[in-house]
A protein has these predicted regions:
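Extended, charged alpha-beta segments that form solvent-exposed binding/catalytic grooves
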Residues: 1-199
Length: 199
């Protein structure tokens, strides 16, 4: 008699019928948003040559990537832990066109350690802009992000901007003197919401 128990590896997520339909519906809504902002959809493979997966510096990618010997050419292939490096390689192929490129992607990734995620096989969604960065591009990518996050119907959205140049440019465009601008920047760094409102 066959064992009817169904086991899946720890940290790996399955989508059952109802969840799969909801998931696909959400995926199509996200694709429509990408199309609205003229981002071109690409689907890189989950297995790729190691050099395509490790184009970004950092031990995280190196340590988390599952490596497999490719006996057909004595090379090494890996299972991606992040799709972003593959986008860099895709953009490199069209570098000679000398024009800004917008790419978007969605796909499974696999991590040895689930730290920072709710599973070992999270589904990654992202957009990459390759070209000269401007204030317009910064605003565009933030609006795109907000449109996608809004699909979650969360009542509160918090966006942390790691690059202070955006905040500095924003504050420079406000009609305030340099002293107030400096105080406001300090409050922003301290995340002092009450003081920011009072300012």
């Amino acid at each position: 008699m066959k064992d009817k128990k169904f086991f899946i590896p720890d940290g790996i997520e399955y989508y059952m019928p109802k969840e799969a339909i909801s998931f696909e519906t959400l995926r199509h809504k996200i694709l429509k948003i990408f199309k609205k902002y003229k981002y071109n959809y690409v689907i890189p493979p989950i297995f790729d040559n190691l050099e395509n997966l490790l184009t970004l510096k950092g031990n995280d990618l190196q340590n988390e990537t599952i490596k497999i010997n490719n006996y057909s050419n004595d090379g090494t292939i890996g299972v991606r832990v992040d799709i972003t490096p593959q986008l860099s390689r895709i953009d490199y192929q069209s570098f000679l066109e000398h024009k800004p490129n917008r790419y978007c992607y969605m796909g499974d990734i696999l991590r040895i350690n689930a730290e920072g995620f709710d599973r070992k096989n999270p589904y990654q969604v992202g957009a990459e802009y390759f070209g000269q960065l401007t204030k317009k591009v910064d605003v565009e990518i933030i609006k795109l992000l907000v449109d996608i996050i809004t699909l979650s119907k969360s009542k509160k959205i918090l966006i942390e901007l790691g690059d202070l140049s955006f905040i500095n440019l924003f504050l420079q465009n406000l009609n305030i003197n340099s002293k107030t601008r400096s105080i406001l920047l300090d409050f922003i760094n301290l995340k002092s919401n009450h003081e920011i409102k009072e300012c």
